[in-house]
Amino acid sequence: MKTMKPSASEFVTLRGLRHHVRTWGSASAKVKAPRAPRLFLLHGWMDISASFQFLVDSFQQDWHVIALDWRGFGQSEQRNEPYWFPDYLGDLDVLLDHYSPDEPACLVGHSMGGNVACLYAGVRPQRVSKLITLEGFGMKESDPTLAPARVAKWLDQLKTTPSFRDYANRDEFIQRLLQDNPRLKPEQAVFLMENFSVENEDRNEEKQGSLEKRDKRLGYDADPYHKLTNPVPYHLDEAKVFWRAITAPVLWVAAQDSFIMKAFKGYEADYAARQACYRNLQTAMLEDSGHMMHHDQPQKLAALIEGFLLAQGSDSVSDPMSDTND
């Protein structure tokens, strides 16, 4: 793997919780093109800020990149109790006040991070100058008839202590990462293991009449309470109201082979209706990429992001359901 751009870690208290914030570049970094402020990268569910390393390494400009670990992920403080989606918007609001109090921000959000960014940009349109959503396209409309069962499942989950699977050693953790994403390069998997695993010392277990301390095992550095079912249903019509309120130019990036795009097969009208909510939209499709596009195609994704951020403005919209790239 080529030499990685160095990052620095900071810890900032956001709404009472200690958050880890990873930065690349300097606060005074400037680009030649106008309207290129600091760049905020927002990771998805079960991911971390370090996951953007490959994307940052592919940028050609000297950005001041700011990426937090969302609450309960990575090195940010864990609640050890259920998480609520609106809290991410509150955390982002304070994060921008801290790092970019006097100018609107450029936001890049992947998956859950993209959904947070798109809602936030509708609530605080004056705080966002440009928005890039990497398959943060909203979720499936909740079936109201399943609401009682959904809440019942959540109540049952509250009676147990959640946990993630752990792994015997580094190699086993790496193999799981490679299994989850066949496009992941071995050196990428090693980097992710080093940044997203934590040692869990097993409790003493009785073995053949004596207590024997087992070796430490590796687990995900995330709060298992993130696994709990969200008892609050998702209302697509409400999300669309947020999206329609966005004033910033938006780049909508899809990955050709992702489970997100596969889920929209046969639902092209729904897909188009979501896109139609954005008043200033450009789209792009990444070929030979799954959902983790910042791992699968970091160079191509970096080129898309920088091309969009540094452009003087464009109203063109391409069809991401086609096989052509923007």
Predicted regions and their residues:
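Post-His helix in hydrolase/transferase enzymes
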Residues: 295-307
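Catalytic histidine-centered segment of alpha/beta-hydrolase-like enzymes
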Residues: 286-298
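Alpha/beta-hydrolase
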Residues: 168-261
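Conserved hydrolase catalytic core segment
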Residues: 103-147
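Conserved acidic catalytic loop of the alpha/beta-hydrolase fold
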Residues: 89-104
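Conserved loop-alpha-helix segment in the C-terminal half of the alpha/beta-hydrolase fold
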Residues: 245-289
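Conserved HGGG/HGGXW glycine-rich cap/lid loop of the alpha/beta-hydrolase fold
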Residues: 23-78
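Alpha/beta-hydrolase fold catalytic core
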Residues: 1-39, 60-63, 99-103, 138, ...
